[in-house]
Curated annotation (Swiss-Prot):
<dbReference type="GO" id="GO:0009853">
    <property type="term" value="P:photorespiration"/>
</dbReference>
<feature type="active site" description="Proton acceptor">
    <location>
        <position position="293"/>
    </location>
</feature>
<dbReference type="InterPro" id="IPR036376">
    <property type="entry name" value="RuBisCO_lsu_C_sf"/>
</dbReference>
<feature type="binding site">
    <location>
        <position position="203"/>
    </location>
    <ligand>
        <name>Mg(2+)</name>
    </ligand>
</feature>
<keyword id="KW-0120">Carbon dioxide fixation</keyword>
<keyword id="KW-0602">Photosynthesis</keyword>
<protein>
    <recommendedName>
        <fullName>Ribulose bisphosphate carboxylase large chain</fullName>
        <ecNumber>4.1.1.39</ecNumber>
    </recommendedName>
</protein>
<feature type="binding site">
    <location>
        <position position="177"/>
    </location>
    <ligand>
        <name>substrate</name>
    </ligand>
</feature>
<dbReference type="InterPro" id="IPR017443">
    <property type="entry name" value="RuBisCO_lsu_fd_N"/>
</dbReference>
<dbReference type="GO" id="GO:0004497">
    <property type="term" value="F:monooxygenase activity"/>
</dbReference>
<comment type="subunit">
    <text>Heterohexadecamer of 8 large chains and 8 small chains; disulfide-linked. The disulfide link is formed within the large subunit homodimers.</text>
</comment>
<feature type="binding site">
    <location>
        <position position="173"/>
    </location>
    <ligand>
        <name>substrate</name>
    </ligand>
</feature>
<keyword id="KW-0560">Oxidoreductase</keyword>
<keyword id="KW-0601">Photorespiration</keyword>
<dbReference type="InterPro" id="IPR000685">
    <property type="entry name" value="RuBisCO_lsu_C"/>
</dbReference>
<feature type="binding site">
    <location>
        <position position="326"/>
    </location>
    <ligand>
        <name>substrate</name>
    </ligand>
</feature>
<feature type="binding site">
    <location>
        <position position="204"/>
    </location>
    <ligand>
        <name>Mg(2+)</name>
    </ligand>
</feature>
Length: 474
């Protein structure tokens, strides 16, 4: 049987173990526009040269293994291998560096975040020669992006569906997150929506437990939405969590909610990218918005030296599909440095983002007109945080006050009213040219003079702050 010889065949097969850097470290390589580029923070074991550690990452995340193999002669490694094309020392870190690796596009299945991540991060993180490894950023080429659907609808389509413009959207996670009956759950939804919120939502771990089966919850929530819409004249919504044990069950729950224009919610990391992409395509086909919760993200992204940065997970989610995703708050109870957070918020929402190392963005990213994803600020926020949230996140965001609504001393509806009044006051002040960060306290106090609900919330939470140093910084 005849076949064409590759460059490797012309040299001949040489069995044995050789340094990775002899094959996979190519500092003279110029990345192509079609390459997927990765920036890894590498901490090698003592005694392992930087070039060898970087080349090992390139090899083990593409075509390499620990020894030469005869079947290398049956392909063209120069065409398919990953290449470490640059090593960047980190100031103040003698044992760490950034390795830049280019992957040929042919290594990846079209439209598959699952396959892309399996290759790039699936095996190499357990490599013994590395003390720690973190994927800081990816550059996804336009040629690969065009094989993905992306978000089911995107920011502008959501605005048009809801007929709400010029301000962030206001939401609330129903608490307690577990234990309520379906009927009492629906009651809380109704009270929050009637009080002035745009949305309420399921929490990440409410699926279909013995105390509240999914079908019962969906039906009581539907009644609550319809009643609140009729009374307020506004379009209302609730994020129904359809995360399930199987993809078939997940799609069945989404199909059940389709007829009353529901908003679907999904835990994209615990359920997996295959399930998320499947659900995203179903939501686009059926005209349903898709809300994404990032449950489990901190297991991967919180440690500075090991794991996957959330900006990478955010890019992957935009490709896989979701109309909004939780991003942290900067000011609330959850981890989030301001510069870093705004960096990946822009990566979610904007069409073209320039490289900006001050915000942790290692590569310029062109999204090729893929719809944007709305950022969701949620976790330990209350009315005093409203000016900062509006200033930080702008209009294309969902601000979700769970305890900051349901913890109001007068009940759920007054809690919702307090948040709506605070939001409207901040938007008016911003539009009048006032400085929300400098004058935010005065703006809230002025609004509280004519809103007893807001005044009560201000008094309750005036001492509550979450002032801890962020662990993940530039």
């Amino acid at each position: 049987m005849a076949y064409t010889q590759s460059k490797s065949q012309k040299v001949g097969y040489q069995a044995g173990v050789k340094d990775y850097r002899l094959t996979y470290y190519t500092p003279d390589y110029t990345p192509k526009d079609t390459d997927i580029l990765a920036a890894f923070r590498v901490t090698p074991q003592p005694g392992v040269p930087f070039e060898e550690a970087a080349a090992a990452v390139a090899a083990e995340s593409s075509t390499g293994t620990w020894t030469t193999v005869w079947t290398d002669l049956l392909t063209d490694l120069d065409r398919y291998k990953g290449r470490c094309y640059d090593i960047e020392p980190l100031p103040g870190e003698d044992n760490q560096f950034i390795a830049y690796i280019a992957y040929p596009l042919d290594l990846f299945e079209e439209g598959s975040v699952t396959n892309m991540l399996t290759s790039i991060v699936g095996n190499v993180f357990g490599f013994k020669a590395l003390k720690a490894l973190r994927l800081e950023d990816l550059r996804i080429p336009v040629a690969y992006l065009k094989t993905f659907q992306g978000p089911p609808h995107g920011i502008q389509v959501e605005r048009d569906k809801l007929n709400k413009y010029g301000r962030p959207l206001l939401g609330c996670t129903i608490k307690p997150k577990l234990g309520l009956s379906a009927k009492n759950y629906g009651r809380a939804v109704y009270e929050c929506l009637r009080g002035g919120l745009d949305f309420t939502k399921d929490d990440e771990n409410i699926n279909s437990q013995p105390f509240q089966r999914w079908r019962d919850r969906f039906l009581f929530v539907a009644d609550a939405i319809h009643k609140a819409q009729a009374e307020t004249g506004e379009i209302k919504g609730h994020y129904l969590n359809v995360t399930a044990p199987t993809c078939e069950e997940m799609l069945k729950r989404a199909e059940f909610a389709k007829d009353w224009n529901a908003i679907i919610m999904h835990d994209f990391l615990t359920a997996g990218f295959t399930a998320n992409t499947t659900l995203s395509k179903g939501c686009r086909d059926n005209g349903m918005l898709l809300h994404i919760h990032r449950a489990m993200h901190a297991v991967m992204d919180r440690q500075k030296n090991h794991g996957i940065h959330f900006r990478v997970l955010a890019k992957c989610l935009r490709m896989s599909g979701g109309d909004h995703i939780h991003t942290g708050t900067v000011v609330g109870k959850l981890e989030g440095d301001k510069a870093v957070t705004l960096g990946f918020v822009d990566l979610l929402r904007e069409n073209y983002i320039e490289q900006d190392r001050s915000r942790g963005i290692y590569f310029t990213q062109d999204w090729a007109s893929m719809p944007g994803v709305m950022a969701v600020a949620s976790g330990g926020i209350h009315v005093w945080h409203m000016p900062a949230l509006v200033d930080i996140f702008g209009d294309d965001a969902v601000l979700q006050f769970g305890g900051g609504t349901l913890g109001h001393p007068w009940g759920n509806a007054p809690g919702a009213t307090a948040n709506r009044v605070a939001l409207e006051a901040c938007i008016q002040a911003r539009n009048e040219g006032r400085d929300l960060m400098r004058e935010g306290g005065d703006i809230i106090r002025e609004a509280a003079r004519w809103s007893p609900e807001l005044a009560a919330a201000c008094e309750l939470w005036k001492e509550i702050k979450f002032e801890f140093e962020a662990q993940d910084t530039i």
